[in-house]
C-alpha cells in the first residue's frame, strides 16, 4: 500500500526503490528513429538513409519491421510467417553488408520479432536449436516456444546471438499472443522483457530492448512500445495524456508511433503536429504502415508542413545535451523526462485541468497542438496553465506573466511551424550546435539558451558512452563516470547579472579538449557584455574569435566563443545591466492580422484600434461587424472570434 496523498513524486521514487529504477539509456536512443512496416530491400533502405543525410534530416536509429525475415515464402505446413529468424534473401542477400552499411551511416539498428511460434524447420537456425532442445530434426519437429524450459531459453538466445554477430544492435520484441505459459501466473511478455534486457548487457554492451509494457515494474526494461496507433486527431490528442500519466507508475521511456501507423486519413497538418509532439516525447520514433500513401518522409508533404517537419527533427537532435542530462536524472533521481503538471503543483486544482500539457525535464513546459488549426486565424489553439511566475516562449522569447499564486490559464495560438513551449524565468537549456553531427559523442560545439527574470542553474552531464565505464548502477557511477558542467545564472534584478560556466568536474576525459560556445540570452533587450575566462578578460590567445549579435525577432542577445579550452571557467557580465525586452505587441498583432483569412477593411480597423488603445482595444474588436446592406455597398466587416483570441493572447500575455 502506497499512501502518499498528493506527494506524487515521493510515491514514484519509493515505488522505484522497491521495483527498480529506470536504467540509463544509450545516447543514440534519444535521437530520431526511422521505422516503417514496409518491404524494404537492402538497396532501397540504404538509398533512403542516404537521402535523409543529403536532405539534412538526422536519424540515429533504424527500425526494421518484420519483413526482414521470411514471411510470404514460408510453406503453409509450417504455419504463418509471422514468427521468423531467417533473413529474406530476396530483399537482403547479404545481411552483414546491409547492417554494416547502416553502422557506417551512424545508425544503430533494431529488428522486429514475434517469438510465439518458436523455431520451425524452415529456419536457418533450426538445426542448431533442435539439437540444443533435443527435438527430432529429421521429423522437422518444431522447437516450441517455452520460456519455462531452460534448453529452449539457451537455444533461443544462442540464435539471437548469432544474428547479432551480423550487426543487430537490439531487438524489437513485438509480443502479441497473450499471457499464458506452462507455469501458471508467469507472463511470457514479462519474462521476455527481463531476459532480453539482461542478455543485451552481456560482454559490456549497453543494454536496451524495445518491447511492450508488461505491468508495474516494467520501467526496468526500456524502451516501451505503446502499440499501433490510428492516424487521427483523436489518437494524437490522447498521446500527451497517456505519456505523462504513465509517469505516475514510474514508466517514462515510451516510444509511440509518431505520425500514426495505420487507417485514419491523410491530413498534413496532423502529421506536422505529431512530429512536433514527437520532438518533446521520451522517444521520437516515426512510424507508418506499408500503404504507399502513408510514408512519413518529409518530402512527401507540401510546404510549409515539410519544413516544419525537418526543423523539428533537427530540433530534437539539437536538444541532445539537455535530453541526456534528463536521462541521467531519470536513472539517478527517478524522475521521468515527461511528467504531468500536477507533480510540481499538487495542491493547485488548475494543474489537473490541462491533460495535454506536461513538463519536459526540469526546464521546459510543453503544450502540443492536438486539434486542427482554425482556418481564419491560420493558427492552432491550445489552452495552457502556467504556475506563478514569469514564463518565456522558448522559441521567440515573448514573456508571459502569471502573477496569481494559483497560476494562470490562457489560450495560446501557434502557426504550423511550432507549438507552445515555455521556459520559466531563469531557465537554462543546453543544446548541440550542429544537429547533423554524430549523436553518439559529446559535442564540441554547444548552444546554451538562457532566460532572464530569475536566478537559475543547470548541471549538464556527459559520459564516455561506454557501458563498462558508466556501469549499470547509474547512481554509483555518476561521480566516477560522468563529467558535470555546472552553469549558474545570477539575475540580480537585471542590475548586474552574470552567467557562469564552470570548468567540468568528475571524469573530464570524456569532454572535448576545446569547445565552441554560443550563449543565447533570450527575451532581453540589447546590452553590452563582457566575457571573462579564468579570471581574466577574454583575449585572442584564449579563444579563436568572439562575436556578439542581437536577433530582434527572438529578442536574443548572443555571444559566440570559439575554441575555448574546456578547463576554462567562462563568466559573462553585463556592466550596464540587462533589461527584459519590451513586448513587441504591435508587430505581433500585425503579423496575426496579416495571416488572418478575413476582410481587409476589418484588418485595417482592428489594427488602428490596437495601435491607438493597446490592450483597451479588446472590447472594441467584437464591435467590428457590419453586413453588406445592398449591392452597391462595398463596405462590410467581420472579425472572426479566433482572430480576436490570437490578438488577446498578445495583448494580455504580460
Kindly give the residue locations of the regions a language model identified.
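Accessory, solvent-exposed terminal regions and/or long lumenal/extracellular loops of proteins
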Residues: 423-538, 549-551, 560-654
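Proteolytic-maturation and junctional protease-sensitive modules
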Residues: 384, 388-402, 521-549
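Catalytic-domain carbohydrate-binding cleft regions of carbohydrate-active enzymes
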Residues: 1-418, 423-424, 466, 647, ...
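Acidic/polar residues at beta-strand termini and the immediately following turn/coil
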Residues: 146, 393, 463, 492, ...
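Short strand-edge motifs at loop-to-beta-strand transitions and within beta-strands
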Residues: 555-557
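A short local loop/turn or secondary-structure capping micro-motif enriched for an aromatic residue
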Residues: 375-376, 401-403, 408-412, 431, ...
Amino acid at each position: 500500500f502506497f499512501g502518499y496523498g498528493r506527494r506524487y513524486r515521493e510515491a514514484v521514487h519509493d515505488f522505484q526503490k522497491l521495483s527498480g529504477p529506470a536504467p540509463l539509456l544509450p545516447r543514440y536512443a534519444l535521437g530520431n528513429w526511422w521505422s516503417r512496416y514496409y518491404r524494404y530491400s537492402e538497396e532501397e533502405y540504404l538509398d533512403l538513409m542516404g537521402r535523409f543525410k543529403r536532405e539534412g534530416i538526422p536519424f540515429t536509429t533504424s527500425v526494421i519491421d518484420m519483413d526482414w525475415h521470411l514471411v510470404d515464402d514460408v510453406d503453409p505446413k509450417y504455419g504463418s510467417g509471422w514468427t521468423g529468424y531467417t533473413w529474406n534473401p530476396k530483399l537482403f542477400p547479404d545481411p552483414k553488408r546491409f547492417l554494416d552499411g547502416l553502422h557506417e551511416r551512424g545508425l544503430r539498428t533494431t529488428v522486429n520479432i514475434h517469438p510465439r511460434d518458436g523455431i520451425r524447420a524452415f529456419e536457418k537456425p533450426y538445426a542448431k536449436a533442435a539439437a540444443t532442445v533435443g527435438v527430432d530434426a529429421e521429423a522437422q519437429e518444431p522447437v516450441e516456444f517455452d520460456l519455462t524450459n531452460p534448453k529452449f531459453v539457451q537455444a533461443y538466445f544462442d540464435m539471437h546471438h548469432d544474428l547479432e554477430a551480423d550487426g543487430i544492435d537490439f531487438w524489437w520484441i513485438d509480443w502479441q499472443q497473450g499471457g499464458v505459459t506452462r507455469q501458471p501466473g508467469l507472463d511470457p511478455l514479462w519474462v521476455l522483457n527481463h531476459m532480453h534486457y539482461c542478455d543485451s548487457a552481456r560482454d559490456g554492451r549497453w543494454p536496451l530492448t524495445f518491447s511492450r509494457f508488461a505491468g508495474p515494474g516494467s520501467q526496468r526494461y526500456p524502451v516501451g512500445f505503446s502499440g499501433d496507433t490510428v492516424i487521427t486527431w483523436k489518437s494524437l490528442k490522447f498521446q500527451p495524456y497517456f505519456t505523462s500519466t504513465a509517469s505516475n507508475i514510474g514508466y517514462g521511456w515510451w516510444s509511440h508511433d509518431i505520425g500514426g501507423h495505420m487507417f485514419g486519413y491523410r491530413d498534413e497538418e496532423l502529421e506536422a503536429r505529431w512530429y512536433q509532439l514527437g520532438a518533446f516525447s521520451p522517444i521520437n520514433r516515426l512510424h507508418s504502415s506499408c500503404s504507399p500513401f502513408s510514408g512519413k518522409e518529409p518530402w512527401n508533404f507540401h510546404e510549409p508542413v515539410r519544413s516544419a517537419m525537418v526543423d523539428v527533427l533537427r530540433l530534437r537532435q539539437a536538444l541532445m545535451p539537455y535530453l541526456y542530462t534528463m536521462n541521467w536524472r531519470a536513472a539517478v533521481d527517478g524522475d521521468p523526462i515527461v511528467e504531468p503538471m500536477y507533480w510540481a503543483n499538487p495542491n493547485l486544482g488548475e494543474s489537473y485541468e490541462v491533460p495535454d500539457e506536461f513538463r519536459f525535464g526540469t526546464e521546459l513546459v510543453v503544450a502540443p497542438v492536438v486539434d486542427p488549426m482554425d482556418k481564419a486565424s491560420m493558427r492552432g489553439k491550445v489552452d495552457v496553465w502556467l504556475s506563478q511566475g514569469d514564463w518565456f516562449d522558448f522559441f521567440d522569447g515573448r514573456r508571459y506573466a502569471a502573477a496569481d499564486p494559483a497560476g494562470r490559464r490562457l489560450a495560446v495560438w501557434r502557426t504550423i511551424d511550432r507549438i507552445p513551449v515555455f521556459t520559466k524565468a531563469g531557465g537554462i537549456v543546453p543544446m548541440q550546435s550542429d544537429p547533423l553531427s554524430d549523436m553518439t559523442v559529446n559535442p564540441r560545439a554547444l548552444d546554451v539558451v538562457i532566460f532572464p527574470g530569475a536566478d537559475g542553474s543547470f548541471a549538464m552531464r556527459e559520459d564516455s558512452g561506454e557501458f563498462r565505464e558508466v556501469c549499470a548502477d547509474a547512481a554509483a557511477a555518476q561521480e566516477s563516470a560522468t563529467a558535470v558542467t555546472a552553469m549558474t545564472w545570477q539575475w540580480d534584478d537585471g542590475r548586474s547579472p552574470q552567467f557562469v560556466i564552470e570548468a567540468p568536474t568528475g571524469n573530464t576525459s570524456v569532454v572535448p579538449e576545446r569547445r565552441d560556445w554560443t550563449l543565447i540570452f533570450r527575451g532581453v533587450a540589447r546590452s553590452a557584455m563582457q566575457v571573462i575566462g579564468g579570471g581574466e578578460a577574454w583575449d585572442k590567445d584564449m579563444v579563436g574569435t568572439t562575436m556578439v549579435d542581437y536577433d530582434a525577432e527572438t529578442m536574443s542577445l548572443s555571444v559566440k566563443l570559439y575554441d575555448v579550452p574546456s578547463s576554462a571557467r567562462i563568466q559573462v557580465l553585463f556592466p550596464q545591466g540587462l533589461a527584459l525586452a519590451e513586448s513587441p505587441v504591435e508587430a505581433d498583432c500585425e503579423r496575426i492580422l496579416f495571416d488572418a483569412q478575413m476582410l481587409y477593411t476589418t484588418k485595417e480597423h482592428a489594427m488602428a484600434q490596437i495601435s491607438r488603445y493597446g490592450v483597451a482595444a479588446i472590447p472594441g474588436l467584437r464591435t467590428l461587424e457590419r453586413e453588406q446592406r445592398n449591392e452597391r455597398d462595398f463596405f462590410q466587416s467581420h472579425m472572426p472570434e479566433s482572430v480576436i483570441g490570437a490578438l488577446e493572447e498578445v495583448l494580455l500575455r504580460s
